[in-house]
Amino acid sequence: MLSNFLKVNSKALGHIRTFASKSGEIKHNFKKADTYLCDGPSDSTVTNKDELISFFTEMSRFRRLETVCDGLYKKKLIRGFCHLYTGQEAVCAGLESAITKDDHIITAYRDHTYMLSRGATPEEIFAELLMKETGCSKGKGGSMHMFTKNFYGGNGIVGAQCPLGAGIAFAQKYNKTGNVCLAMYGDGAANQGQLFEAFNMASLWKLPVIFICENNKYGMGTSQKRSTAGHDFYTRGHYVAGLKVDGMDVFAVKEAGKYAAEWCRAGNGPIILEMDTYRYVGHSMSDPGITYRTREEVNHVRQTRDPIENIRQIILDNKIATEDQLAAIEETVRDEMEKASEKAIAAPLPQARELFTNVYLQEVPVRGVEFVNSFKP
């Protein structure tokens, strides 16, 4: 978890705490969210040195995690599907800061950073990607099927996680927990019929679910302009309120997330958040990402809207830290991820008997299973 990371690496951050203690509160303005059937949050917030350093560190960890994944895949140590989150870090960091660990998240196949934000260790994530027994799913889930407490994956079927998210929210309402569920999906899933069915049932039963469309502009290699008749995804719930948010500004995401969580906890039912974001990489590792868009387009977003660079600039402008101090944080993050990947590479593969675990909750009476049972622990 980030809190533990900051404690362990207090040496690298110590000078920053001392230097920044004089700066106090900092007001940050961002693009106001477009609204539909609701008022929406403010277009400004007050932050401080601790939150700024925390966001910078966490998003740096997200990006370095995915950079290491990219390298492991190219070395053919990671096999199969692998979808990276590079460029979209502000969405994950901002939403996580807007809710509690008792709240729930379910997403699609770009799930590595959500595992990290929910409390999994980098080693558990890398080990799962490498199909090792120390992985978070014991090597059986791979890139798309990672799970930890109050995080339900990683789902490989486009849009299928949204009805599940409504179901998780139904459980919260039924059990009167007061918690909410974030159901993440991309613009490529925004036309799936099951999504609209989930909108309907969630609205009918006023379920505490926040449907979050991470609009990174491309569903695989198809631009949203070529696949969707209506581009305002935050209005497509018809009777469900919605917001369109600058998904590259972590504070805009945080404030929208807080507004949405309060909306749901107040018993208003579901709400849709459309995150205007961008992925720098291809759809998956098998996609170079430049056959359907130009390098100039990608570089323009990197240079003008990068979420980590935006935070870096706020920190420098307000004299929270120096370039050297931020570089020290990044170096610590690199070391953390490299060491975690080395441990994951060295970890053993799962035993054959692991194939037969976690299949049924209770023993199932089946004849002729002596051979299979011989592999069980």
Swiss-Prot record:
<dbReference type="GO" id="GO:0045335">
    <property type="term" value="C:phagocytic vesicle"/>
</dbReference>
<dbReference type="GO" id="GO:0005759">
    <property type="term" value="C:mitochondrial matrix"/>
</dbReference>
<feature type="binding site">
    <location>
        <position position="218"/>
    </location>
    <ligand>
        <name>pyruvate</name>
    </ligand>
</feature>
<feature type="binding site">
    <location>
        <position position="156"/>
    </location>
    <ligand>
        <name>pyruvate</name>
    </ligand>
</feature>
<dbReference type="GO" id="GO:0004739">
    <property type="term" value="F:pyruvate dehydrogenase (acetyl-transferring) activity"/>
</dbReference>
<keyword id="KW-0809">Transit peptide</keyword>
<keyword id="KW-0460">Magnesium</keyword>
<keyword id="KW-0786">Thiamine pyrophosphate</keyword>
<feature type="binding site">
    <location>
        <position position="188"/>
    </location>
    <ligand>
        <name>pyruvate</name>
    </ligand>
</feature>
<feature type="binding site">
    <location>
        <position position="218"/>
    </location>
    <ligand>
        <name>Mg(2+)</name>
    </ligand>
</feature>
<keyword id="KW-0670">Pyruvate</keyword>
<keyword id="KW-0560">Oxidoreductase</keyword>
<feature type="binding site">
    <location>
        <position position="283"/>
    </location>
    <ligand>
        <name>thiamine diphosphate</name>
    </ligand>
</feature>
<dbReference type="GO" id="GO:0046872">
    <property type="term" value="F:metal ion binding"/>
</dbReference>
<keyword id="KW-0496">Mitochondrion</keyword>
<dbReference type="GO" id="GO:0006086">
    <property type="term" value="P:pyruvate decarboxylation to acetyl-CoA"/>
</dbReference>
<keyword id="KW-0479">Metal-binding</keyword>
<dbReference type="InterPro" id="IPR017597">
    <property type="entry name" value="Pyrv_DH_E1_asu_subgrp-y"/>
</dbReference>
<feature type="binding site">
    <location>
        <position position="187"/>
    </location>
    <ligand>
        <name>pyruvate</name>
    </ligand>
</feature>
<feature type="binding site">
    <location>
        <position position="187"/>
    </location>
    <ligand>
        <name>thiamine diphosphate</name>
    </ligand>
</feature>
<feature type="binding site">
    <location>
        <position position="189"/>
    </location>
    <ligand>
        <name>pyruvate</name>
    </ligand>
</feature>
<feature type="binding site">
    <location>
        <position position="216"/>
    </location>
    <ligand>
        <name>pyruvate</name>
    </ligand>
</feature>
<feature type="binding site">
    <location>
        <position position="83"/>
    </location>
    <ligand>
        <name>pyruvate</name>
    </ligand>
</feature>
<protein>
    <recommendedName>
        <fullName>Pyruvate dehydrogenase E1 component subunit alpha, mitochondrial</fullName>
        <ecNumber>1.2.4.1</ecNumber>
    </recommendedName>
</protein>
<feature type="binding site">
    <location>
        <position position="158"/>
    </location>
    <ligand>
        <name>thiamine diphosphate</name>
    </ligand>
</feature>
<feature type="binding site">
    <location>
        <position position="110"/>
    </location>
    <ligand>
        <name>pyruvate</name>
    </ligand>
</feature>
<feature type="binding site">
    <location>
        <position position="156"/>
    </location>
    <ligand>
        <name>thiamine diphosphate</name>
    </ligand>
</feature>
<dbReference type="GO" id="GO:0045254">
    <property type="term" value="C:pyruvate dehydrogenase complex"/>
</dbReference>
<feature type="binding site">
    <location>
        <position position="216"/>
    </location>
    <ligand>
        <name>thiamine diphosphate</name>
    </ligand>
</feature>
<feature type="binding site">
    <location>
        <position position="187"/>
    </location>
    <ligand>
        <name>Mg(2+)</name>
    </ligand>
</feature>
<feature type="binding site">
    <location>
        <position position="110"/>
    </location>
    <ligand>
        <name>thiamine diphosphate</name>
    </ligand>
</feature>
<comment type="subunit">
    <text>Tetramer of 2 alpha and 2 beta subunits.</text>
</comment>
<feature type="binding site">
    <location>
        <position position="216"/>
    </location>
    <ligand>
        <name>Mg(2+)</name>
    </ligand>
</feature>
<feature type="transit peptide" description="Mitochondrion">
    <location>
        <begin position="1"/>
        <end position="26"/>
    </location>
</feature>
<feature type="binding site">
    <location>
        <position position="189"/>
    </location>
    <ligand>
        <name>thiamine diphosphate</name>
    </ligand>
</feature>
<dbReference type="InterPro" id="IPR029061">
    <property type="entry name" value="THDP-binding"/>
</dbReference>
<feature type="binding site">
    <location>
        <position position="158"/>
    </location>
    <ligand>
        <name>pyruvate</name>
    </ligand>
</feature>
<feature type="binding site">
    <location>
        <position position="109"/>
    </location>
    <ligand>
        <name>pyruvate</name>
    </ligand>
</feature>
<feature type="binding site">
    <location>
        <position position="188"/>
    </location>
    <ligand>
        <name>thiamine diphosphate</name>
    </ligand>
</feature>
<comment type="function">
    <text>The pyruvate dehydrogenase complex catalyzes the overall conversion of pyruvate to acetyl-CoA and CO(2). It contains multiple copies of three enzymatic components: pyruvate dehydrogenase (E1), dihydrolipoamide acetyltransferase (E2) and lipoamide dehydrogenase (E3).</text>
</comment>
<dbReference type="Pfam" id="PF00676">
    <property type="entry name" value="E1_dh"/>
</dbReference>
<dbReference type="InterPro" id="IPR001017">
    <property type="entry name" value="DH_E1"/>
</dbReference>
